[in-house]
């Protein structure tokens, strides 16, 4: 075993040594109710939130129990919704309860189905034993084997179990029930089968990607069991095991790797810097599975609160900031026709996507647009055919909704704000989030006001760098993905009535050329907002599509006066150009209404517009230049 892995694994092993003890709290009822075909089982895991980061025994029990539940759920829910978990809380709201109450029963979806509540995932496994083939057992000393176990679980219909022969462990309970171990990622005597971080991934690539046992449709970028060394870094639900179910259901490949090749990975500091090469090897194989015409949906995010960044909480610090690690990850994914569904810390926990994937949505959710005649009627185009030379037209870009976990967690608070409908807001929500959270998307559309307009968030139907799709392609050298990206986006934009892509993050990748802009014009004809434009331009028109440069700066101040002052400062940076927008992240309608009132009080020339009026007026302005 190499020294770097040994150092970290010894620390993890010390934590796990306590596992011979019983859990701090016994969460298992004496008996479980019987279930029948068609019943929906609700697995209530709310009491596991009582575990704290200081409870080393409880942390281990939490990990192994959640891992069992998530991999079981992904398999059980693959073909129909049967197993629902209650666990995730955000802003004081149990969001699993919230979406269940909004969308299930009483004249809604699944009305009439019998619901059985259970508390112990082992007994839930007993109830659904016919759905699985056995166990995949992984090594507590080699952290990466936990992610490989989730890969194997989905491909082989197994549940993931951490090796621990002590009394009370999940492993002991299941082997005592005679569940067969079908795949060992640790030797049967508990000694390590693999000895470095990357060895298990090489094995998984050879046995599950190259053989086609995994689907190229999805992949999953979630922290491995290294999480247990510092569980308090990003919230106790940020093991993100609850997120695994969807990707298990879709036979996705799980990984946790650094995107950098200029330093060793934080979790293997003396093993060299091979993570990036392994990252590329994985996605090269996924690209082959997809034939260069389909895109891979990658859930998750670089675990920057634990690894691969210079964040103060990281034990072995990177020299790179968290945002740079995010951008480098997206650059790599983009090079291989993969996009991110960015479940980022510390709002990244989401349960039940494998359940909700079956939620029925409408074929189309149309949205209206505006016309030049409408703009004239509103006085936005003057009688002389020009627009005012003194006005500054402003749009609220409301984001960053590029993660299913974020809309799952945050919309129960933000969307229910009583001020919604009093201020025009361009909700920029990535339409591909409908794969994991279709009920959220449907609920937003069904309850929207005239002031709520929807655009695609970064960067269309998935978060990637579109400039990385153009030949010659950096990193991968693969053929152009520009046309394939447009074809990927078109059905999403049609179904969700979208014609604007708000913020296009170019990140560490190159900006788009004319080819890329023309491609976006085929599915986002009413506007896009990239970070990078040629020749330092602020705006341009391509095939009738208005393009407005967005620097990426956002206003995060909580106090309205502070936010308003910053907004006014930003709006004064380009006095010669009559259009600007204010990008916000996870801000409420009440906040937006307050900022609107503040900036309009500073000058009668500040005019906040709805998205259709804004982009149609921008198009008209650019056509006149």
Q: What name fits each language-model region?
A:
Residues 18-28:
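Bacterial Sec-dependent N-terminal signal peptides
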Residues 354-445:
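Active-site beta->alpha N-cap acidic-glycine motif
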Residues 1-8:
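Bacterial N-terminal signal peptides that target proteins for export
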Residues 9-18:
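Bacterial N-terminal signal peptides
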Residues 342-372, 612-625:
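A recurrent domain-boundary module in secreted/ectodomain proteins
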Residues 272-303, 394, 399-408, 412, ...:
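Catalytic grooves of carbohydrate-active enzymes
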Residues 430-498:
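Substrate-binding cleft of extracellular glycoside hydrolase catalytic domains
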Residues 26-363:
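Preference for solvent-exposed, low-hydrophobicity sequence contexts
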């Amino acid at each position: 075993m190499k020294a770097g892995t040994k150092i970290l694994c010894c620390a993890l092993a010390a934590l796990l040594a306590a596992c011979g003890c019983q859990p701090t709290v016994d969460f298992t009822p004496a008996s479980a109710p019987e279930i029948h075909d068609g019943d929906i089982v609700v697995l209530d895991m709310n009491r596991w939130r009582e575990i704290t980061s200081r409870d080393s025994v409880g942390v281990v029990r939490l990990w192994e129990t959640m891992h069992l539940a998530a991999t079981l759920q992904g398999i059980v829910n693959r073909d129909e919704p049967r197993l629902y978990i209650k666990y995730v809380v955000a802003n004081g709201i149990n969001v699993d309860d919230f979406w269940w109450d909004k969308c299930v029963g009483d004249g809604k979806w699944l009305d009439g189905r019998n619901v059985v509540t259970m508390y112990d995932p082992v007994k839930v496994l007993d109830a659904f034993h016919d759905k699985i083939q056995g166990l995949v057992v992984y090594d507590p000393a080699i952290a990466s084997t936990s992610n490989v176990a989730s890969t194997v679980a989905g491909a082989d219909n197994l549940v993931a179990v951490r090796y621990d022969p002590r009394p009370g462990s999940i492993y002991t309970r299941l082997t005592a029930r005679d569940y067969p171990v079908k795949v060992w990622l640790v030797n049967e005597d508990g000694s390590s089968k693999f000895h470095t971080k990357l060895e298990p991934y090489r094995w998984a690539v050879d046995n599950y990607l190259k053989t086609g046992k995994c689907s190229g449709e999805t992949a999953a970028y979630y922290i491995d069991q290294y999480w247990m060394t510092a569980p308090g870094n990003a919230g106790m639900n940020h093991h993100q095991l609850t997120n695994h179910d969807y990707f298990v259901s879709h036979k996705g490949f799980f990984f946790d790797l650094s995107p950098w090749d200029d330093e060793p990975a934080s979790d293997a500091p003396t093993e060299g810097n091979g993570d990036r090469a392994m990252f590329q090897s994985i996605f090269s194989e996924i690209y082959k599975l997809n034939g260069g015409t389909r895109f891979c949906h990658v859930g998750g995010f670089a675990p920057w609160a634990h690894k691969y960044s210079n964040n103060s909480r990281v034990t072995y610090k990177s020299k790179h900031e968290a945002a740079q690690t995010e951008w480098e990850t997206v650059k790599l994914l983009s090079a291989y026709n993969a996009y991110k569904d960015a479940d980022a810390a510390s709002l990244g926990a989401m349960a039940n996507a494998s359940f909700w994937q079956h939620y029925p949505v409408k074929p189309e959710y149309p949205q209206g647009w505006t016309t030049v005649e409408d703009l004239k009627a509103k006085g936005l185009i003057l009688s002389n055919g020009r627009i005012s030379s003194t006005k500054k037209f402003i749009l609220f870009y409301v984001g960053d909704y590029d993660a299913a976990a974020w809309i799952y967690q945050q919309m129960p608070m933000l969307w229910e704000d009583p001020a919604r409908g009093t201020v025009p807001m361009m909700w920029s929500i990535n339409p591909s989030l409908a794969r994991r959270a279709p009920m959220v998307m449907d609920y937003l559309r069904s309850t929207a006001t005239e002031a709520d307009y929807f655009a695609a968030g970064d960067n269309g139907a998935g978060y990637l760098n579109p400039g990385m799709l153009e030949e010659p392609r950096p990193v991968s050298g693969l053929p152009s993905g520009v046309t394939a990206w447009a074809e990927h986006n078109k059905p999403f934009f049609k179904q969700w009535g979208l014609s604007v892509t708000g913020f296009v993050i170019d990140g560490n990748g190159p900006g788009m050329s004319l080819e890329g802009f023309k491609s976006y014009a085929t599915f986002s004809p009413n506007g896009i907002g990239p970070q990078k434009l040629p020749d330092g331009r602020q705006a341009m028109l391509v095939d009738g599509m208005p393009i407005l440069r967005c620097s990426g700066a956002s206003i995060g101040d909580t106090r309205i006066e502070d936010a308003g002052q910053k907004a006014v400062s930003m709006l004064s940076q380009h006095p010669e150009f009559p259009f600007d927008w204010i990008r916000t992240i996870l801000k409420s309608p009440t906040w937006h209404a307050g900022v609107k009132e503040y900036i309009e009080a500073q000058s009668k020339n500040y005019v906040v517009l709805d998205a259709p009026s804004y982009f149609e007026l921008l198009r008209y302005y650019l056509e006149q230049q």
